[in-house]
């Protein structure tokens, strides 16, 4: 939630001089009460800031330009208290580059049947003023969201809050820097993609670094800093005998701490908030970064394995979106299946890199064990399971002419049986609507084998994100029917081809 404290959403009231000073004074007074009420009672993640009433095209244009250049402003929330002729908004909306939410509300909840007169009617014109504003948005093909409801309604609060989270994530996306240590895993297709196209679409940049650049920083870490981090490990986790003092793999734990400190310093020095590694590019490192990656994800960094920069960026963006919510968000991979009639399950995991924010255990196990991939020393890692609850897996892929997001809703379950020989963190879930349908749909749509797994975010967040980023979205949930899903793939292909002309 700390990420949101410095951010603002500007609350903008549109009107016109036609109504006279007394009506405009009352509009301003009502707006102040609405903003104060929302800030105090709606549990919104981002503060609303009331801006001066805009009544002319020049005022609207100036405000939109100002919003573009204020880094702490993540978007505009507009309310048409009275009628605001929408031609006045064309100039401002033409230049606006921040997310826009139209709050279709009114000051009073109910009609004052006994006292309502024409003065009241002229003051409270959201019902048609909002439609005028909506027309110009549609006419300009302006991507904006609409929330309808009274400003004291809890459902409206929830929807505004979700929009704020997505707006903050989009702001993060525009300034995000992703570091790739090494390259993509050789011969893997889905982790490739158009980095220039991604920067144009999402705003984030992706830069490659040789392992020598990283190892130079890792090698410079002092023994004192390593010892201090080891003390933190011993307080936070259940260490196995192998990594305790004088244990057979104690040095592996010391090496992991050194890698963590070096990676974090490298990322901080470069202003990176997401990164990738690749087990085929480990020259100069003593082990594949496992514990380091897990702990950096827990601190909010995005990560993708095998050079998967799209998933690394998406994880960081979703972590920002989920700030302060219960439940965690992690890098994930569908690893293996349990095909059992009536109990089909997916075991999600990775070689090492699963984020502890999704851990069920308060103190995960910390161990160093053999890893047959990478050809390095036994890597340290945290081992835990994941609590039951509603979850989702999200993936962004490059289709060549567009970016496609897939979201599969899943139901995470308690681990049904012990896994005494599995030395990695994991989550176990039932895919919606079934493993058979979900896997077939995912494969038909080209979904990646890497995903972002979240128990903090829901489909509303992801749908909003796709809409506000203007990317394709395919949802796999309990409503999915394969013949309809295949039709959607065909229709989308035509739609996006036409849109690209």
Swiss-Prot record:
It comes from the Bacteria. GO terms for cellular component: cytosol. The keyword Metal-binding applies. Keywords: Arabinose catabolism, Carbohydrate metabolism, Isomerase, Manganese, Metal-binding. It catalyses: beta-L-arabinopyranose = L-ribulose. Binds 1 Mn(2+) ion per subunit. Pathway: Carbohydrate degradation; L-arabinose degradation via L-ribulose; D-xylulose 5-phosphate from L-arabinose (bacterial route): step 1/3. It holds the Pfam family AraA_N. It is an enzyme of class 5 (isomerase). Its cofactor is Mn(2+). One of its GO terms (biological process) is L-arabinose catabolic process to xylulose 5-phosphate. Homohexamer. This is L-arabinose isomerase. It comes from Pectobacterium atrosepticum (strain SCRI 1043 / ATCC BAA-672).
């Amino acid at each position: 939630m700390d990420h949101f404290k410095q951010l603002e959403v500007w609350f903008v009231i549109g009107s016109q001089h036609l109504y006279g000073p007394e009506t405009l004074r009352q509009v301003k007074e009502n707006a102040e009460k609405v903003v104060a009420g929302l800030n105090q009672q709606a549990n919104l993640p981002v503060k609303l800031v009331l801006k001066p009433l805009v009544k002319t095209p020049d005022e609207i244009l100036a405000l939109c330009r100002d919003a573009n250049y204020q880094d702490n402003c993540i978007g505009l929330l507009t309310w048409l208290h009275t009628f605001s002729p929408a031609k006045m908004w064309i100039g401002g909306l033409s230049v606006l580059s921040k997310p826009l939410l139209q709050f279709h509300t009114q000051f009073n909840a109910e009609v004052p049947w006994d006292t309502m007169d024409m003065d009241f009617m002229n003051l409270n014109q959201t019902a048609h003023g909002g439609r005028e504003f909506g027309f110009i948005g549609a006419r300009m093909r302006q991507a904006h969201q609409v929330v309808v409801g009274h400003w004291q309604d809890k459902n409206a609060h929830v929807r505004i809050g979700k929009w704020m989270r997505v707006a903050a994530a989009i702001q993060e996306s525009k300034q995000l820097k992703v570091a790739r240590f090494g390259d993509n895993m050789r011969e893997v297709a889905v982790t490739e993609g158009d980095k220039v196209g991604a920067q144009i679409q999402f705003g984030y940049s992706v830069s490659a670094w040789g392992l020598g650049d990283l190892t130079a920083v890792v090698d410079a870490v002092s023994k004192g800093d390593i010892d201090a981090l080891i003390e933190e490990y011993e307080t936070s986790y259940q260490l196995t005998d192998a990594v305790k003092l004088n244990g057979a793999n104690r040095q592996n734990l010391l090496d992991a701490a050194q890698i963590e400190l070096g990676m974090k310093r490298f990322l901080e020095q470069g202003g990176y908030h997401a990164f990738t590694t690749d087990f085929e590019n480990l020259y100069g490192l003593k082990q594949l970064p496992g514990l380091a990656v897990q702990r950096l994800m827990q601190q909010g960094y995005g990560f993708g394995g095998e050079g998967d920069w799209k998933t690394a960026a998406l994880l960081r963006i979703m972590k920002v979106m989920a700030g302060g919510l219960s439940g965690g968000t992690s890098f994930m991979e569908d690893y293996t299946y349990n095909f059992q009639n009536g109990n089909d399950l997916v075991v999600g995991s990775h070689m090492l890199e699963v984020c502890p924010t999704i851990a069920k255990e308060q103190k995960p196990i910390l161990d160093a064990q053999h890893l047959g991939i990478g050809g390095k020393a036994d890597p340290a890692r945290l081992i835990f399971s994941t609590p039951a609850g509603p979850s989702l897996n999200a993936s962004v892929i490059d289709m060549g002419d567009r970016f496609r997001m897939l979201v599969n809703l899943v139901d995470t379950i308690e681990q049904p049986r012990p896994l005494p020989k599995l030395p990695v963190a994991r989550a176990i879930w039932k895919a919606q609507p079934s493993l058979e349908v979900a896997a077939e749909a995912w494969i038909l749509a080209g979904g990646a084998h890497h995903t972002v797994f979240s128990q903090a975010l829901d489909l509303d967040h992801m749908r909003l994100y796709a809409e506000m980023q203007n990317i394709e979205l395919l949802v796999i949930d309990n409503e999915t029917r394969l013949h309809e899903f295949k039709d959607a793939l065909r229709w989308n292909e035509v739609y996006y081809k036409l849109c690209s002309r």
